[in-house]
């Protein structure tokens, strides 16, 4: 769908990029889509740190920021503009802040422990 304006933003990471994307999307004559990182209580951390967590998502490379503007093609420019740099933070640190990821990691640990327990019990039962 090369005719759709698409941007991925995180207000807590780069407010100017978010505003720029909104202005570009609003001025585009065709369909526009803005995909925004939106912190929420279900992520499992204090909402007072929501903007900082958005920045951590971008800094870790988990949430890359970009703008795809089809108008740039007509101007002889690449339509995709990346608005982020190389990762500056750990993905593990980002995930550790959110209980939604800790729950998944906890499940994996429990599943591994259950596998070990099953193997142990299956080899130590009555002959």
Predicted regions and their residues:
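Cationic, amphipathic, low-complexity alpha-helical segments enriched
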Residues: 103-124
């Amino acid at each position: 769908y090369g005719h759709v304006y698409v941007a991925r933003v995180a207000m807590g990471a780069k407010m100017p990029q978010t505003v720029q994307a909104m202005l570009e999307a609003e001025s585009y004559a065709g369909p526009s889509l803005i995909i925004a990182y939106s912190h929420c209580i279900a992520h499992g951390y204090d909402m007072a740190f929501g903007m900082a967590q958005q920045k951590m998502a971008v800094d870790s490379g988990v949430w890359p920021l970009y703008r795809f503007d089809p108008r740039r093609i007509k101007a002889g420019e690449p339509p995709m503009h990346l608005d982020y740099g190389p990762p500056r933070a750990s993905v593990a640190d980002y995930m550790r802040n959110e209980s939604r990821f800790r729950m998944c990691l906890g499940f994996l640990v429990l599943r591994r422990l259950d596998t070990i327990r099953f193997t142990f019990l299956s080899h130590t039962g009555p002959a």
